[in-house]
């Protein structure tokens, strides 16, 4: 499933589309595209809010399996990808949210996304989930921890169509013992 939203002011929710074009600046026509962005609360330890930084969050990718897990934990029928700002929804990549940084997701056109990091949950989807599940959608942030997918940036441009097969490339890594 592929989703996009051209207007950031309209909110987090995105609409389904049949195909997208990945550009070096992100998804063509999506509000989260761009080479740079303003830093936000996720970066307060490094930068003052609003500092211009490289946009490594051009694309948000979730999995059908992890969305179902979140809904089960929250005891609601479903958590729709539209509600959580997803651009892509995959199936069959185990523990998608735990893909290591620098993993590559490559599509049949050659288009490639580099995983920047896990997309930690925030309160904004909780508001949308609550609106769609009155008095039931408590605890999204806790339920979605390590299950809200990954964010990444475009390494190679190209077309992506709904239903495309994804080849996943995982870099060799070892644990850094001094963190």
Model region roles, listed by residue range:
Residues 1-108, 178-179:
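Electropositive, beta-rich accessory/interaction domains or terminal extensions
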Residues 111-113, 119, 167-179:
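Short, charged beta-turn/beta-strand-edge "cap" motif at the junction between a beta-strand
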Residues 133, 140, 149, 165-170, ...:
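Acidic/glycine-rich phosphate/pyrophosphate-binding loops and surrounding catalytic core
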Residues 91-94, 98-154:
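Glycine-rich active-site loops that engage anionic ligands at enzyme catalytic sites
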Residues 105, 113, 160, 166-167:
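Generic structural signal for buried aliphatic residues
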Residues 27, 66-67, 95, 112, ...:
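Short, glycine-/Ser/Thr-/acidic-enriched flexible segments
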């Amino acid at each position: 499933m592929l989703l996009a939203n051209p207007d950031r002011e309209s909110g987090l929710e995105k609409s389904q589309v049949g195909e997208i074009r990945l550009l070096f600046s992100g998804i063509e026509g999506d509000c989260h595209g761009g080479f740079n962005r303003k830093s936000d609360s996720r970066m307060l330890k490094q930068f003052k809010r609003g500092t211009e930084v490289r946009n490594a969050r051009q694309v948000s990718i979730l999995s059908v399996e992890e969305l179902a897990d979140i809904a089960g934990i929250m005891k609601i029928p479903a958590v729709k990808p539209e509600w959580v700002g997803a651009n892509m929804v995959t199936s069959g990549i185990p523990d998608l949210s735990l893909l290591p940084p620098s993993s590559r997701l490559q599509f049949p056109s050659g288009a490639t996304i580099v995983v920047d990091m896990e997309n930690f949950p925030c309160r904004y989807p909780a508001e949308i989930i609550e609106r769609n599940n009155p008095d039931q959608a408590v605890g999204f942030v806790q339920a979605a921890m390590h299950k809200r997918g990954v964010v990444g940036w475009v390494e190679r441009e190209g077309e992506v169509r709904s239903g495309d097969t994804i080849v996943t490339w995982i870099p060799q890594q070892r644990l850094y013992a001094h963190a």
